[in-house]
UniProtKB/Swiss-Prot annotation:
Family: Belongs to the class-I aminoacyl-tRNA synthetase family.
EC number(s) given by UniProt: 6.1.1.19
Upper taxonomic lineage: Bacteria, Pseudomonadati, Pseudomonadota, Gammaproteobacteria, Cardiobacteriales
Gene3D superfamilies on file: Arginyl tRNA synthetase N-terminal domain, HUPs, Isoleucyl-tRNA Synthetase, Domain 1
Name of protein: Arginine--tRNA ligase
SMART domains: Arg_tRNA_synt_N, DALR_1
Subcellular location(s) of the protein: Cytoplasm
Quaternary data: Monomer.
A single MF term (Gene Ontology): ATP binding
Record has Magnesium as a keyword: no
Residue interval(s) of motif 'HIGH' region: 129-139
Record keyword Cell cycle present: no
Superkingdom of this protein's organism: Bacteria
Length: 592
């Protein structure tokens, strides 16, 4: 319908241009129409006359008058009128207004989903938290956003793969293995106090107990046989000057030497597998499923990192300085060059990033979306620079930054830290407010905006809680349809379509207009990678429905035509609420 109106205005514009001797090649601006905020003004409005008044050398109202009389007849349009300085207000016919109900009935859960002739193959990588501990509430926001965005892109007709990048190769995983082994020797009765700076949480003890269950005490060696002496506490100066980190690296090296490669890998792999299982289960209970779990270690084992660096070198963008190998990222606009291989010959995290994104391109994706924490703000320039150095199109890579969420309970901020063990996990949050409420609140704001997550609000059963307010609207629809069945009224949405033009109340027209808007919201939100727009829409539709319900329009009316029409409207509102909630991965409640 919107396209039909735009085409009609376009035809009128060309006709008026020819009448005035205007070169139609000057008519190069898009014809925009927007929904009227005030229904008294009509259904749609266009500023086309204001945009082209100078080209036609006419006053906007004069041009608008000529355009209105030149628009071809359209069944969907009841009339057009000029308003204000030259806006064209458009009123739809009653038949076209209520036709959306036929569309909702025909498509049901597919209403708001599209077949896209320009569909792209898209890879969305998100969460990708180090498997060094349980997911915390900060990771939860990235999970909710990434999964909702994936669902939104699928609704827009794209082929989407979800991917989790496993950081299973590097120092942080070695620190986890060290932490687990330290707890293991404690479990075996020969350990000493756990030093600061390694992982402290109870989950480390769980892995250590599993290690003891599997190996007994055969791998337990006193700490003084493999770890250098350390102070009971680290001073801030020792932390700042790197003494603590050097001690940790020394302890890791000593443990590897003491256990040998095979036994150390066994400790490492046990810690990795248990943490990955925990993360995978946590995410699945949160409604997030990945198509692929991509291992960083697999790139090293398959020599993918060295091969990618070789290609960058062959392109002339690597050089040696101070014993290290550097990438000339400044040649592509980055603020400084980046180390890809340290003095000790080890590759850096950035080298893995280069290899990983090179592999993504080789898999044939049209677009790759990386969803990262806001602390990765400097990441985009260096990765895009590496892609350009490899002769690849850096514009295919989109990086979305997500601010971490901060939890509040009783007005007080809650803290979280993985190493110290004093963190609020995603599992804690799910058990506290439920997965659906958590996802709703996570996606409610733009991802780049700071999010204060009010636990008290998320748990409240009041209209101030947007999650409850939207779910209650769906439950009210279900309640009304159930009541109709209980009272013996026969209702079928397909059969009730013939009654749809009985929906003449202003509140009914407003609700139908909201249903019309839903596909437009899905398209706009998809283009902008903005699932929060779906929640804005949900709140607006819920508000319209609650108002309609509260003003007292009797759905189970004595008049059969009115009753069936209103039940049809109720059914359609329920369906669209359900569809929109599905975009953000939230179950629609039938009872509150």
């Amino acid at each position: 319908m919107k396209n039909e109106i735009q085409d009609g205005l376009g035809s009128a514009l060309i006709l008026v241009a020819k009448n005035h001797g205007i070169d139609i090649r000057l008519l190069d601006q898009a014809i925009e129409i927007e929904r009227c905020k005030d229904p008294e003004n009509g259904d749609f409005a266009s500023n086309i006359a204001l945009k082209y008044a100078k080209v036609f050398k006419m006053k906007p109202r004069q041009l608008a008058d000529e355009l209105v009389v030149s628009v071809p007849l359209m069944d969907s349009v009841a009339g057009m009128e000029v308003a204000g300085p030259g806006f064209i207000n458009i009123r739809l016919s009653r038949e076209s207004i209520t036709a959306v109900l036929e569309n909702v009935v025909a498509k049901k859960e597919r209403y708001g989903c599209f077949e896209n002739p320009n569909a792209r193959k898209i890879l969305v990588e998100f969460v990708s938290a180090n498997p060094t501990g349980p997911l915390h509430v900060g990771h939860g926001r990235g999970a909710a956003y990434g999964d909702s965005l994936s669902r939104l892109l699928i609704a827009n007709g794209h082929q989407v793969d979800r991917e989790y990048y496993i950081n299973d190769f590097g120092r942080q995983m070695d620190i986890l293995a060290l932490s687990v082994y330290w707890r293991y020797v404690q479990e075996c009765g020969i350990g000493v106090a756990l030093p600061k700076g390694i992982y402290q949480g109870d989950y480390v003890i769980d892995i250590a107990k599993k290690l003891k269950e599997k190996e007994g005490k055969r791998l337990a060696y006193p700490v003084n046989e493999w770890a250098p002496d350390y102070p009971q506490t680290w001073t801030q100066e020792q932390v700042d000057n790197g003494d603590r980190d050097r001690w940790i690296d020394g302890a890791i090296a000593g443990l590897k030497e003491k256990l040998g490669q095979k036994e150390y890998r066994g400790v490492f792999d046990l810690a990795l597998s248990m943490e990955l299982d925990d993360i995978r289960g946590d995410l699945e209970e949160f409604g997030v499923f990945f198509d692929r779990w991509f291992s960083e270690r697999s790139m090293s084992e398959n020599d993918m990192i060295n091969n990618a660096l070789k290609k960058v070198d062959e392109a002339g963008y690597l050089y040696e300085k101070d014993g290290a190998v550097w990438f000339k990222s400044t040649a592509f606009g980055d603020e400084k060059d980046r180390v890809v291989r340290r003095k000790n010959g080890m590759t850096t995290y950035f080298s893995s990033d280069i290899s990983y994104h090179f592999d993504k391109y080789n898999r044939g994706y049209d677009q790759m979306i990386d969803i990262l924490g806001a602390d990765h703000h400097g990441y985009m320039a260096r990765v895009r620079a590496s892609l350009a150095a490899l002769g690849l199109d850096p514009e295919k890579l989109v990086i979305a930054l997500v601010q971490f969420a901060v939890l509040y309970k009783g007005g007080e901020k809650m803290q979280m830290s993985t190493r110290s063990g004093e963190f609020v996990t995603l599992r804690d949050l799910r058990e506290h407010v439920g997965a659906d409420a958590a996802r709703f609140f996570y996606v409610m704001r733009k991802p780049e905006q700071h999010l204060d997550f009010d636990l008290d609000l998320a748990e409240s059963n009041s209209k101030d809680n947007p999650f409850y307010y939207v779910e209650y609207a769906h439950a009210r629809c279900c309640g009304m349809l159930n009541k109709a069945e209980e009272e013996g009224y026969e209702f079928s949405p397909e059969a009730a379509l013939k009654c749809r033009n009985a929906l003449v109340e202003p509140e009914e027209t407003a609700l139908i207009s909201e249903l019309h808007r839903y596909p437009e919201v899905v398209i706009a939100a998809g283009k902008q990678m903005a699932p929060h727009q779906v929640i804005i829409y949900l709140k607006e539709l819920a508000t319209r429905w609650h108002h309609y319900y509260d003003v007292g329009h009797k759905v189970l009316h004595e008049d059969e035509e009115i009753r069936n029409a209103r039940l049809l409207l109720t059914w359609a509102v329920r369906q669209v609420l359900r569809n929109a909630l599905a975009i953000i991965g939230v179950q629609a409640r039938e009872r509150m």
